[in-house]
Regions:
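Generic protein-terminus/edge-of-domain signal
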Residues: 1-47
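A generic beta-sheet turn/junction motif
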Residues: 36, 52-54, 79-81
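Ligand-binding loop in jelly-roll beta-barrel domains
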Residues: 71-93
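Conserved small/polar residues in nucleotide/adenosyl-binding loops
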Residues: 100-107
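Jelly-roll (double-stranded beta-helix
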Residues: 29-32, 81, 98-99
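Short acidic-glycine-tyrosine-enriched beta hairpin
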Residues: 54-66
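A cytosolic small-molecule/anion-sensing beta-strand core signal
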Residues: 44, 60, 79
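Histidine-centered metal-chelating micro-motifs
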Residues: 29-30, 49, 65, 69-74, ...
């Protein structure tokens, strides 16, 4: 975490949750970075790949992935994509009560 940039988006806003809407071109790849708030990444359009030290997650359209506060990560995609993020204060009362790891699922 300390070796990568700190993205401080929304930290100056005195609210428990801050929202960000983003549009990215095909081939986008962020630098590795981290946030003081937890980040819920929602793929509105396109497919997003989120990579951390713990692994990589493919987030298809209309799905989301949770990135806990202060976890170094990178966001990228081969195609253009639209993304919404909720940045949630790193406070025990705002953390998910429980969650499960991603698993393969057939429909």
């Amino acid at each position: 975490m300390q070796s990568s940039p700190h993205d401080s988006y929304g930290e100056e806003i005195d609210r428990p949750v801050v929202v960000r809407a983003s549009e990215y071109p095909a081939g986008y790849s962020s630098d590795h970075h981290w946030h003081a708030r937890g980040q819920l990444v929602y793929a509105c359009d396109g497919v997003v790949k989120v990579t951390t030290e713990q692994g990589a997650w493919i987030v298809p359209q209309h799905r989301a992935v949770w990135i806990p506060a202060k976890i170094e990560h990178q966001i990228e995609s081969a195609g253009a994509f639209s993304m919404r993020s909720l940045y949630i204060q790193d406070n025990p009362k705002f953390k998910p009560v429980s969650y499960t790891h991603l698993r393969a699922h057939e429909t």
